[in-house]
Regions:
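Short, well-structured N-terminal submotif of metal-dependent ribonuclease cores
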Residues: 1-45, 50-66, 133
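Hydrophobic core segments within long, regular secondary-structure runs in both alpha-
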Residues: 25, 67-70, 74, 93, ...
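Generic detector of contiguous secondary-structure segments
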Residues: 27-37, 76-86, 129
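Active-site neighborhoods of divalent-metal-dependent phosphate/nucleic-acid chemistry enzymes
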Residues: 79-137
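Helix-adjacent hinge/juxtasegments
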Residues: 52-86
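Short, surface-exposed, polar/charged, turn-prone segments marking secondary-structure boundaries
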Residues: 31-33, 64-67, 74, 114-115, ...
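C-terminal binding/interaction regions
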Residues: 146
Length: 146
């Protein structure tokens, strides 16, 4: 089974100080043996999100921790612990836009939230891991467990 994780889930998984770290680790252990995948969206968003967190006015992430998280992520991709899969850009953007049209009028969803859902669907993910309940609800409607 393919497991697709939202970027914020990966950040919790990779950061010991994160409030959801233990929950993320336990979820990953339950899914051991399945294929955890990443795509271009993760490769773009995760480093940018971590760097942005160093500039927060409240509880900024220290730069050395941010660099460690990015390095751990890169090593997991390079070492094939996280399997890199390509997503068709045109199709994933169209799907994300459709999801926004369907769900974005009822609740707030960011571009990346919708794009991750579209990518997971295009990669035939059976599980979508996220801490965002709104995103998880849509994943469930799309047939993915979470």
């Amino acid at each position: 089974m393919i497991v697709y994780c939202d970027t914020s889930w990966f950040l919790s998984y990779l950061t010991e100080d994160d409030e959801n770290h233990v929950i993320a680790r336990e979820a990953a252990e339950k899914l051991a043996g399945h294929d955890f995948v990443v795509c271009e969206i993760h490769l773009l968003e995760l480093p940018a999100a971590v760097r942005a967190a160093t500039h927060r006015t409240q509880d900024p992430v220290p730069e050395h921790i941010a660099r460690r998280v990015i390095n751990r992520f890169d090593r997991a991709v390079t070492g094939k612990i996280l399997l890199r899969k390509e997503v068709d850009m045109k199709d994933s953007v169209a799907m994300a836009r459709s999801l926004g049209e369907t769900h974005g009028w009822k609740e707030r969803h960011t571009t990346f939230d919708l794009w991750h859902l579209a990518a997971a669907w295009s990669l035939s993910a059976g599980t979508f891991l996220t801490f965002d309940q709104r995103q998880g609800k849509i994943a469930g409607l799309m047939g993915m467990s979470n």
